[in-house]
Design a protein with these regions (language model features):
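Positions that flank functional sites
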Residues: 158, 175, 196
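Conserved Rossmann-fold dehydrogenase catalytic segment
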Residues: 190-205, 233-234
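Extended, subdomain-level signal for the structured scaffold at the beginning of enzyme domains
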Residues: 2-150, 158-162, 178-182, 188-189, ...
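Structural detector of well-ordered beta-strand residues that form the stable sheet scaffold
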Residues: 150-151, 172, 189, 200
């Protein structure tokens, strides 16, 4: 794929991620870039979980990176925004509104990605409000099953902590939430991304890029991750902490 095509693809992906919340499948990618290639195997199904007060960069970075990975592998990658409450419009931390057309269906996902947001404003929409409400942490706890990887970034990790998912597990989060994560039983690691098999966590805000690039490398291979880094003009930061064995 040449540079002009890559830049055009990036623009299309950015628009899709921030305005429609729709899955960018292989057919859409081919239309956007003027290219097509045979696909094989089962698709990698990614659900990015949204809620009112979610941070804009947290929701956009993993979506765009994982959607763009479709161009660097012969495996389809299907990325969708979902909400626990079904089809609705969410309002992000800085006022961006997104219409989300997909409801909660973790049984149809291989990877759940949980962003953060609103952690500094305890009475505003965001992570604290979702913890008080209780429904999303319960749903995340119940979603766990063999074959599903749950990933979270920034203070989205605290939703997993409230669900009991991080208890006794290596993990990380935004630096302002690290003490509480440890108090609630998380085993803190000093790394930007922590991979403990079916649980992958990342630090604050921009760490969403590194989380997504790591997941691409893990699920789709090094070449896909390198291709994305070149397209995005961004190199993954830091050493990923990984457990000795992955479930």
């Amino acid at each position: 794929m040449n540079r002009r095509t890559l830049l055009r693809t990036t623009a299309v992906l950015g628009a899709a991620g921030l305005t429609t919340g729709a899955s960018l499948d292989a057919a859409t990618a081919a239309t956007a870039t003027g290219t097509s290639a045979p696909r094989r195997g089962d698709p990698l199904r990614v659900h990015v979980v949204l809620f009112d007060g979610v941070e804009e960069l947290d929701l956009a970075a993993p979506y765009e990176v994982l959607s763009a990975s479709d161009h660097f592998t012969d495996r389809d990658v299907e990325v969708q925004y979902v909400t626990l409450d079904g089809r609705r419009t969410i309002t992000a931390a800085f006022g961006t509104t997104l219409r989300v057309d997909r409801g909660w269906a973790p049984e149809k996902a291989d990877l759940l990605v949980v962003p953060g947001g609103g952690y500094a404003r305890k009475e505003a929409p965001g992570v604290w409000a979702e913890i008080r409400r209780g429904a999303l942490p319960r749903a995340l706890a119940e979603a766990r099953r063999p074959g599903l990887t749950i990933a979270a970034l920034c203070t989205g990790v605290m939703l997993l902590s409230a669900a009991g998912v991080t208890r006794g597990r290596p993990c990380t989060t935004h630096h302002k939430a690290r003490d509480l994560l440890q108090e609630q039983g998380g085993v803190l690691k000093n790394a930007r991304v922590v991979d403990d098999g079916d649980l992958v966590t990342a630090g604050g805000v921009t760490s969403g890029l590194d989380l997504a690039l790591w997941l691409v490398r893990r699920e789709l291979g090094v070449d896909a991750a390198l291709g994305l880094e070149a397209m995005l003009e961004y190199e993954a930061r830091g050493t990923v902490w990984t457990s000795a064995t992955r479930s």
